[in-house]
Curated annotation (Swiss-Prot):
It comes from Influenza A virus (strain A/Equine/Kentucky/1/1987 H3N8). Disulfide bonds join 29-481, 67-292, 79-91, 112-154, 296-320, 488-492. The record marks 344-345 as: Cleavage. Residues 551-565 are cytoplasmic. The gene is HA. Its main location: virion. A lipid is attached at residues 554, 561, 564 (S-palmitoyl cysteine). One of its GO terms (biological process) is virion attachment to host cell. This is Hemagglutinin. Residues 17-529 are extracellular. InterPro entries: Capsid_hemagglutn, Hemagglutn_HA1_a/b_dom_sf, Hemagglutn_influenz_A, Hemagglutn_influenz_A/B. The chain crosses the membrane at residues 530-550.
Length: 565
């Protein structure tokens, strides 16, 4: 019985000598922030990797209206820019107007003599970029002809009229002499002259208006010459007319001379438009114009320019994000996300960053969880958190700076004759968009890779910093945790966090506890052996005592044992 008691006491001593079962050790784990539901982003090495935070880089919707602040937006209402320039009677309100962006509506219509412009897109672009319809009348002398031709197709009020910026010349009496007129440009700016030629619907109309069976118009400068012959013939009726007017334009540089020669069918200029160089433009849109502020306008409406990319519309005006084909591109602004597990670590209550992240951290991206004689706790590490944030902050602004530029991208128009040019332009434009789309995806993937790498690096830096502080006073348990072999209260844990921990103070205690643990059982598993040996010896002694009792009882006659063969 004495032996049994000794073995039981030995077993109790084994447990009592375990430093971790009392107040002599502590556990410290390092970890990082995690969220229950992260955001998937793309990196160079992964198509989908989860991060705690990400920012959308693609603006995919407009505000549904065009803002009239930041730019002078002129609503064309029922008028196109060209009709306003020519002086269509119902567009007289736009004479001498200025704009940054002229908005053409789908409801716009012409309400004068039917016309066509062979190079419509170029003229529209030139007038739009000038940003004004400032017009100066000049004293052209037209001798021997009748000026100010009118048409019932072009009403100004109830009276027959014509384009206010053009002078329709017809016969005077029974003659239409050859006209030769010159107009020098003695100014220091370019002048834009608008002129035209009338195509009668029949030979009878031709001779009735111009006497000659076929007229001719030649307009020249030192740099160019255009000769146009009317195409006589019936066309579809428009506003009661089967004839047409073709509109042409000529730019006269400073020091150059405009020369006009004609023997019939001339629609003459009344003066010039002063050309200005600028970033004004024209856009087709049915979005309403409202009082708001935006630096980027699309036909769909204004859009914010706080993102580097947009896929609202290829046509833009102002300081706008680049158009790309992707609907979404997310920039990682947080670390790799590893959602917290329900069962955490070999110590139950805490586990390190290698096993999983920690949800609910509000005071930092990186931090400590600990278990000591005072209980358990958690605290963030502001220094490593700030180091990571400083590197991530500004990423979005840098991407915007690389992609945003003040420019305008107008829609391209080509006549049917220029179909091949149109196809080529569309191919070039599509290629540019494809290239930007690829570059955008690559740029974001590189930035995301850098973000994840640097946040991982900050976690490793914090771990190495802690390991160097603890030295031989603690053991790396793996998984981002340390077992501290001395009593470490909350003040001690705080010194580890703020970098003031002095391992020399605790060195002797830590070494002593470490040797006890190593020598007895914790590290080598001797506890299990001692327990099994103690159990086996106890069972053996119980059997011996029981057998001895039986033999003693037999000798005294208290127990009789009969053996039968």
């Amino acid at each position: 019985m004495k032996t049994t008691i000794v073995l039981i006491l030995l077993t109790h001593w084994v447990y009592s000598q375990n430093p971790t079962s009392g107040n002599n050790t502590a556990t410290l784990c390092l970890g990082h922030h995690a969220v229950a539901n992260g955001t998937l982003v793309k990196t160079i090495t992964d198509d989908q990797i989860e991060v705690t935070n990400a920012t959308e880089l693609v603006q995919s919707i407009s505000i549904g209206k065009i803002c009239n602040n930041s730019y002078r937006v002129l609503d064309g209402r029922n008028c196109t820019l060209i009709d306003a320039m020519l002086g269509d009677p119902h567009c007289d309100v736009f004479q001498y107007e200025n704009w940054d962006l002229f908005i053409e509506r789908s409801s716009a219509f012409s309400n004068c003599y039917p016309y066509d412009i062979p190079d419509y897109a170029s003229l529209r672009s030139i007038v739009a970029s000038s940003g004004t319809l400032e017009f100066t009348a000049e004293g052209f002398t037209w001798t021997g002809v009748t000026q100010n031709g009118r048409s019932g197709a072009c009403k100004r009020g109830s009276a027959d009229s014509f384009f206010s910026r053009l002078n329709w010349l017809t016969k005077s009496g029974n003659s239409y002499p050859t006209l030769n007129v010159t107009m020098p440009n003695n100014n220091n700016f370019d002048k834009l002259y608008i002129w035209g030629i009338h195509h009668p619907s029949s030979n009878n109309e031709q001779t009735k208006l111009y006497i000659q069976e076929s007229g001719r118009v030649t307009v020249s400068t030192k740099r160019s010459q255009q000769t146009i012959i009317p195409n006589i013939g019936s066309r579809p009726w428009v506003r009661g007319q089967s004839g047409r007017i073709s509109i042409y334009w000529t730019i006269v540089k400073p020091g150059d001379i405009l020369m006009i020669n004609s023997n019939g069918n001339l629609v003459a200029p009344r003066g010039y438009f002063k050309l200005r160089t600028g970033k004004s433009s024209v856009m087709r849109s049915d979005a309403p114009i409202d009082t708001c502020v935006s630096e980027c306008i699309t036909p769909n409406g204004s859009i914010p320019n706080d993102k580097p990319f947009q896929n609202v519309n290829k046509v833009t005006y102002g300081k706008c994000p680049k158009y790309i084909r992707q609907n979404t591109l997310k920039l990682a602004t947080g670390m790799r996300n590893v959602p917290e597990k329900q069962i955490r670590g070999i110590f139950g209550a805490i586990a390190g960053f290698i096993e999983n992240g920690w949800e609910g951290m509000v005071d930092g991206w990186y931090g400590f969880r600990y278990q000591n004689s005072e209980g358990t706790g958690q605290a963030g590490d502001l220094k490593s958190t700030q180091a990571a944030i400083d590197q991530i902050n500004g990423k979005l602004n840098r991407v915007i700076e690389r992609t945003n530029e003040k420019f305008h991208q107008i829609e391209k128009e080509f006549s049917e004759v220029e179909g091949r040019i149109q196809d080529l332009e569309k191919y070039v434009e599509d290629t540019k968009i494809d290239l930007w789309s690829y570059n955008a995806e690559l740029l974001v993937a590189l930035e995301n890779q850098h973000t994840i790498d640097l946040t991982d690096a900050e976690m490793n830096k914090l771990f190495e910093k802690t390991r160097r502080q603890l030295r031989e006073n603690a053991e790396d348990m793996g998984g981002g945790c340390f077992r501290i072999y001395h009593k470490c209260d909350n003040a001690c844990i705080g010194s580890i966090r703020n970098g003031t921990y002095d391992h020399y103070i605790y060195r002797d205690e830590a070494l002593n506890n470490r040797f006890q643990i190593k020598g007895v059982e914790l590290k080598s598993g001797y506890k299990d052996w001692i327990l099994w040996i103690s159990f086996a010896i106890s069972c053996f002694l119980i059997c011996v005592v029981l057998l001895g009792f039986i033999m003693w009882a037999c000798q005294k006659g208290n127990i009789r044992c009969n053996i039968c063969i």
